[in-house]
């Protein structure tokens, strides 16, 4: 929630600025404006979190200069985990080193892991009024990427600032980790954090005031307000520019036989990989981000209402495919660690690994591939294919027109309209409760049980089947690419002299599933998918390590 006290949030005045809740603009009471010179700062809040509402200034009348902007992205901890799962190589023939164990040294003295650079790139560091994707030519975009990267790697002020940002991000990581240990879905932990971290990050990057920790905008929120680099075709342009720059640095490192320059190439590539990973977040795949800002008056209202489509696609996910023929269901921001996103996790980690491998290969060979041959691009969700085979998008392009789903509350409504207006659409969306898409699977209501006499081994084995440990199980329903959330966990079974149990797994009696995914959790660890079984199986023997 906002850092404003209740009475402040109702209406604050300071130097001809009035801070008020956006919903008050549409109430009978309205918002009192004392003079022609007053400016109104609206905080869009209500039951939604301000993480997706970035307040700014607008004149009192609707229709001009709305600056309540969405921040739409994978969360920082998610980006960190993706990057730090990568293997980095420095010596030909030697095995890769887990990225979380490697410090990448930057010119300004910062030493960061690959995942930390992925997390900081684009969201926290960049040039707010110079999106990479808006460069007119590949050379222009490469130059813009370099300037964005240098704001982290070269500017002296970034050395201390980045450490403060990462310290706050650790709260997010800790909350997600605790949710995993508790057997909860991590998106619940992100939701519970609300805006508290955004407020801290805004202040760290030069924003905030006595009236609101979110206003004025620091660099963090300015980047969020102009974030086309993180969406669809524009994220693709940003990644290609950054990967190109990193490959050029790797070739230079080869020429000089300088491992320190290879470190810099890896850091540049990690910054670029931020935009690569965004393309695996469902809320970033088909949202017409720039077009909405262009056709809605005021343009910033168009940016604001993209939040609703972003949230829909992130929550329910999209069926996606890539050039290699892989098909999977991808979810979005805050759901990377959720049990239902396991297939997407595999795909995004593989893409980032391919991206990093290409840096080392260019370091060894002294030559760089052309953009048409970048290996990670073959793994990306096909942006055009994702426009079909999914529930009806809230907004969709038809030529140069942005069409809106006719019934905003019905995700299965295929009818679209072109005579919609920004403000009236916002009023429909701000409290809407969309239904569930066709094919949605409800979670099971029962848990697996362990057969009392079904233990398969009396021999302990590393790393988890050990006396003093404990294990429990849950399962989800599946049907093609669709999967439900997991149902309740069984009680922990203490391990002493018996290991590797036989499970009774409840069958589906009405959800329309064709199979089930079985999950296991050792005490203190995170849930893991251990098996997929058909709809008729009633038992499973856990012989997994």
Task: Annotate each language-model stretch with its function.
Residues 3-30, 34-46, 53-267, 285-438:
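N-terminal, motif-rich segments that launch catalysis or mediate targeting to/interaction with membranes
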Residues 33, 42, 50, 501-503, ...:
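Hydrophobic beta-strand residues in large extracellular and virion-surface proteins
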Residues 265-282:
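Active-site alpha-helical segments that house and flank conserved acidic catalytic motifs
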């Amino acid at each position: 929630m906002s850092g404003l006290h209740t009475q402040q949030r109702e209406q604050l005045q300071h130097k001809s600025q009035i801070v008020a809740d956006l919903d008050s603009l549409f109430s009978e009471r309205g918002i009192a404006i004392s003079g022609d010179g007053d400016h109104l700062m609206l905080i869009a809040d209500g039951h939604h979190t301000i993480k997706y509402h970035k307040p700014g200034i607008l004149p009192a009348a609707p229709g001009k200069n709305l600056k309540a902007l969405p921040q739409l992205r994978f969360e920082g901890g998610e980006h960190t985990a993706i990057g730090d799962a990568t293997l980095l190589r420095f010596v030909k023939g030697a095995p890769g080193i887990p990225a979380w164990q490697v410090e990448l040294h930057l010119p300004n003295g910062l030493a960061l892991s690959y995942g930390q650079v992925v997390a900081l790139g684009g969201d926290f560091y960049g040039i707010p009024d110079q999106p990479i994707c808006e460069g007119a030519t590949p050379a222009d975009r490469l130059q813009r990427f370099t300037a964005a990267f240098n704001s982290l790697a070269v500017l002296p002020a970034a050395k201390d600032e980045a450490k403060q940002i990462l310290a706050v991000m650790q709260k997010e990581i800790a909350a997600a980790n605790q949710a995993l240990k508790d057997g909860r879905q991590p998106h619940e932990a992100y939701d519970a954090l609300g805006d508290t971290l955004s407020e801290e990050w805004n202040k760290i990057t030069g924003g905030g005031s006595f009236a609101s920790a979110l206003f004025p905008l620091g660099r963090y929120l300015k980047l969020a307000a102009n974030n086309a680099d993180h969406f669809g075709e524009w994220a693709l342009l940003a990644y290609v520019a950054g990967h190109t720059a990193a490959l050029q640095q790797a070739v230079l490192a080869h020429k000089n036989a300088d491992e320190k320059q290879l470190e810099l190439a890896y850091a540049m590539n990690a910054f670029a990989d931020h935009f690569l990973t965004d393309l695996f977040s469902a809320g970033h795949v088909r949202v017409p981000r720039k077009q909405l800002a262009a056709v809605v008056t005021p343009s910033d209202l168009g940016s604001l209402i993209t939040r609703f489509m972003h949230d829909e696609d992130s929550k329910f996910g999209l069926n996606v495919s890539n050039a290699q023929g892989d098909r999977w269901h991808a979810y979005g921001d805050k759901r990377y660690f959720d049990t239902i996103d396991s297939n997407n996790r595999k795909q995004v980690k593989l893409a980032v690994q391919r991206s990093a491998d290409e840096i080392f290969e260019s370091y060894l060979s002294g030559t760089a591939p052309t953009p048409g041959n970048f290996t990670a691009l073959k793994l990306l969700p096909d942006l055009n294919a994702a426009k079909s085979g999914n529930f009806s998008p809230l907004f969709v392009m038809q030529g140069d027109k942005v069409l809106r789903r006719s019934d905003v509350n019905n995700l299965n409504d295929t009818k679209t309209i072109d005579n919609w207006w920004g403000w009236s659409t916002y009023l429909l969306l701000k409290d809407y409760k969309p239904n569930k898409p066709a094919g949605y699977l409800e979670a099971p209501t029962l848990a697996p049980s362990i057969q009392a006499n079904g233990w398969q081994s009396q021999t302990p084995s590393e790393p988890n089947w050990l006396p003093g440990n404990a294990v429990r199980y849950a399962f989800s329903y599946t049907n093609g690419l669709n999967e439900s959330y997991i149902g309740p966990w069984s009680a922990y079974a203490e391990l002493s002299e018996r290991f590797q149990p036989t499970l009774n797994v409840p069958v589906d009696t009405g959800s329309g599933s064709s199979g089930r995914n079985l999950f296991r959790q050792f005490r203190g660890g995170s849930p893991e998918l251990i098996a997929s079984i058909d709809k008729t199986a009633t038992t499973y023997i856990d012989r997994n390590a």
